[in-house]
């Protein structure tokens, strides 16, 4: 069956310099689910955003805010600080926390086929979820091994 659920666009405020094409200012996260018929989503765990035109909605809606759309504005991971792993495509923990918290329950397992720096696994663990992280890049494996020393590492044969 078709297990693709949605595409999330992570737009950020940092733009690399280029004169040869439109500068890239976003990343894409493709969300797949094991069974679309039993997909779990808890909107109550998602921080709400302010309405862009508050005069067009009721005061109650303004006070509550709205559920974010599939385009999220976020800053990139700072070049220094506790969160930075040194992996070039690392995603901010806050982004993964929003996805994992709303899309899974404690004890569920989260799968990341392009795990990179392992942020998905680190966040999943902090939220009481299990994680299966997959990546074929030796640099990614090294970063994840340093980041999660207690994790079980298996390699494909």
What are these regions (language model features)?
Residues 1-154:
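Core catalytic lobe of class I
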């Amino acid at each position: 069956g078709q297990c693709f659920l949605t595409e999330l666009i992570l737009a950020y405020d940092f733009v690399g310099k280029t004169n040869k094409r439109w500068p890239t200012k976003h990343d894409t996260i493709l969300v797949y689910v094991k069974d679309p018929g039993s997909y779990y989503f808890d909107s109550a765990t998602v921080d709400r955003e302010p309405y862009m035109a508050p005069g067009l909605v009721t005061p109650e809606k303004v006070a509550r805010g709205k559920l974010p759309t599939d385009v999220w504005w976020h800053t990139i991971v700072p070049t220094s600080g506790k969160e930075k792993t040194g992996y070039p495509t690392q995603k901010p923990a806050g982004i993964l926390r929003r996805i994992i918290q709303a899309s899974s329950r404690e004890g569920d397992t989260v799968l990341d086929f392009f795990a990179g720096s392992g942020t998905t696994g680190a966040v999943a663990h902090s939220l009481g979820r299990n994680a299966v992280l997959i990546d074929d890049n030796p640099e990614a494996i090294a970063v994840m091994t340093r980041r999660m020393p207690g994790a079980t590492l298996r390699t494909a044969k």
